[in-house]
Amino acid sequence: MSVFVIAEAGVNHNGRLSTAFRLCDAAKAAGADAVKFQHFNSAALWNDDRIAHLELRDAEIAVIAKHCASIGIEFCCTPFGVREVGVIAPLVKRIKVASGCLEKWELLASVQATHLPVILSTGMATEGRIDRALKALGYYATLEQSLTLLQCTSAYPCRVEDANLLAMDTLAQAFGAEVGFSDHTKGITVAIAAAARGATVIEKHLTLDCTAEGPDHKASIEPQEFRVMVRAIRTVEEALGDGVKRAQPAEAETRRAWYGD
């Protein structure tokens, strides 16, 4: 099993392109498979321009994607509107849908129209709401082999006791999709545990400075800790094995000592 690790840069660039580049570089150095940003229009989305300084313009999104390609890390992005879906679709290999967009039907229809693989966070949602979102995405007809559902608790930060990793099993059984975990807890223990429980995608917020001003920095980890997390996840991958119960080659000498064969 290979875990796809996403470094969620989100809005931790604080509206500065140079910081966005540094986040991409840090994600690559830490061993992440992808780095993810957000594309939104705050006035259109929330009728509130207080976080307008955290927006990235279309041209900036394209420049960040180009930078990611130049350093060898996948560029991911979450669109928060139909227009933004059209902007990012030519730049990404997959689209990440945020928990807050689970009931935005026009957006989901536009995501379906891209025919790209989908990663869907499920924070704040019940099975029934997820089912309706999957119908809007055309999952049952067209996307069955290219959907990953992320267990997510939309609290920043999330308490460990609210992470509910067992819900990954529920999602897998209910919808037959790949499952993963979008982690908002402090530290890296819960993300590593999710990998051990079979998550195929781990998403974790990355910041250059946890003490910086901004909505997500306190629910993020810095590059050195992110690197430790990725290494631990890769160790978990090795330890999981293939599930076949058999005598391992490393046991041969011990078996000979006990049984003589």
Where are these regions (language model features)?
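Catalytic cores and adjacent flexible loops of soluble metabolic enzymes
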Residues: 1-261
